[in-house]
Amino acid sequence: MRIKDGFILRKIAGSDMVVPVGQNIADFNGIITLNGTAAFLWKILKEGSRPSIMAELLMKYYDVNNEIATKDTEEFVNQLKEANILEYDEDEV
C-alpha cells in the first residue's frame, strides 16, 4: 500500500501537515495534522510499504515494543483508509 498521488506532507508553522494538491483539493476537504510518529509512518508509506514492515521500522527508530508499534501503525493506517488516502497493489486487495 502507498499514499495516493495528490497528497503531500508539508511543515507549516512547525507542524507536519498533509495537504491535498491538484484534483484532491476539491475532493478532500481540509488538511491533516500529523504528530512525529505519524509523519515518520507517512514518509514510509509514500514509498509504499506493509503494516508489518512499518511497525518494525517504528520499533527500531523509536525504540518501542512490538505491541505499541503495531497498535500505532494499525491506527494510522485505519485513519488513512477512512480518509481514502491509500492505494493498494493488486496482491493487497
Where would I find each of the regions flagged by the language model?
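Long, charge-rich, low-complexity alpha-helical segments
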Residues: 30-93
